[in-house]
Regions:
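Alpha/beta-hydrolase fold catalytic core
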Residues: 2-65, 88, 304
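Conserved HGGG/HGGXW glycine-rich cap/lid loop of the alpha/beta-hydrolase fold
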Residues: 48-103
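Active-site loop/oxyanion-hole signature of alpha/beta-hydrolase fold enzymes
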Residues: 92-131
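Conserved hydrolase catalytic core segment
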Residues: 127-165
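Hydrophobic, aromatic-rich cap/lid helix
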Residues: 212-237
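Short beta-strand/loop motif that positions the catalytic acidic residue
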Residues: 245, 251-253
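Conserved alpha/beta-hydrolase "acid-adjacent" motif
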Residues: 258-267
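Catalytic active-site module of serine/aspartate enzymes centered on a nucleophile-bearing elbow/loop
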Residues: 276-304
Length: 304
């Protein structure tokens, strides 16, 4: 490996370490604040087709917007975004199956998660705008493809597909190892594997384990396999799915992700190319953990 290449790898790892450290160490505090803010608020539940109970929060007035979170996230992680959108929309933030207050039903399939979203959309009146981040963007894309006019508009941020050299083989190896750890109920090790896969150094993982967020992450660890299933067997952009999307779509990535996560830009570019009529936007100054204060005005303009 030449010196320039080594320097680039170190730089990208350092950048990603900072991003992950700030994002995940702040997660515990954000959840605690959200729980305090929501104390006494009635929790809503909708029943999916297979009997799974999906917990959700509902706030605001206006057209329905459903927020779909990514890996190791619950509805509390989107609480700030929901509050910012609530003056203009009725915002539904939900716990994906197996997370938070939602139940789970075996066997898992991505189709079941689409049915969960459909139940929520039906509860919201039969159609909704949908925003998804990371693996939640992948799920939102699948739902928009499958549910047709029920998804009025679709906004996705950094769906984690990658067609970089060697990405498919690395993905299959990661999935096999993760499935083995989860089968052995080694949840902490499964989370550690996941964080290592996305580039977090050992010291960042150690800080996360000591953070208030860790216990909740362990509880959600089995759903990492669900995220993997949604992203797909080889992590490639799902062209056949994307071409079936009827909703007006906004595809986003953050300008600050280009260094630590260089696959995000070509992935977003390709998605915008294959989704019919899709709009494309690079969110300046933002990385994978996009700021709700930056994102909310973009979604407000697009969904209106």
């Amino acid at each position: 490996m030449n010196a320039n290449r080594a320097t680039t790898i170190v730089f990208r790892t350092a950048c990603l370490a900072g991003i992950l450290s700030l994002a995940f160490l702040a997660k515990g505090q954000a959840r605690a604040e959200a729980q305090r803010a929501d104390k006494g608020k009635a929790r809503h539940v909708v029943t999916s087709r297979d009997g799974t109970r999906i917990a959700y929060d509902k706030q605001g007035n206006g057209p329905a917007v459903i927020v779909v979170n990514g890996a190791l996230s619950s509805r509390s992680d989107s609480a700030q975004l929901a509050r910012l959108l609530a003056p203009h929309f009725t915002v539904y933030s939900y716990d994906r199956r197996g997370r938070g207050d939602s139940t789970d039903t075996a066997p898992y399939s991505a189709r079941r998660e689409i049915e969960d979203m459909e139940a929520l959309i039906d509860k919201a009146g039969g159609s909704a705008c949908v925003y998804g981040k990371s693996s939640g963007a992948s799920l939102a894309l699948e739902a928009a493809s499958a549910l047709g006019d029920k998804v009025r508009k679709l906004a996705i941020y950094e769906a984690p597909y990658s067609e970089a050299e060697g990405a498919a083989a690395q993905w299959r190896d990661f999935r096999a190892k993760l499935d083995g750890l989860l089968a052995a109920n080694r949840r902490a090790d499964a989370i550690t594997l996941f964080m290592t896969f996305v580039g977090a150094p050992d010291e960042v993982v150690a800080k996360m384990k000591a953070s208030p967020a860790w216990a909740g992450m362990e509880a959600m660890a089995p759903t990492l396999a669900y995220d993997n299933a949604v992203v797909g067997d080889d992590r490639s952009v799902p062209v056949a799915t994307a071409t079936q999307v009827k909703a007006v779509t906004l595809v986003m990535d953050g300008s600050a992700s280009a260094g630590p996560m260089p696959f995000m830009r070509p992935t977003a570019d390709k998605l915008a190319k294959v989704i019919p009529g899709a709009q494309r936007r690079v969110v300046e100054g933002q990385a994978h953990d996009v700021s709700p204060e930056v994102l909310a005005p973009i979604l407000l303009k697009f969904f209106n």
